[in-house]
Amino acid sequence: MKTRVAVISIIIRDKNEVEKINEMLHEASDYIIGRMGIPYRQKNINLISVAVDAPEGVISALSGGIGQLPGVTVKTAYSDVITETP
């Protein structure tokens, strides 16, 4: 199986979606290298950056699923680091 390193950047404008996002990230926890959350109180938004090493399909599904939530914006940056695992 080929895995790829990527960073998923999430901007949350609707705080009601935070619990759903955390559930989705928990489901993908086997692939998460690390994450950082920053509350930006002056703008009333939250920023989350998630580093992953996963198959492209998993990254795409996670990013797409989170991006479907109302009040949430997602962008994913893929590295050229691809690893073949048995």
Role assignments for model-derived ranges:
Residues 1-86:
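Long, contiguous binding/interaction regions
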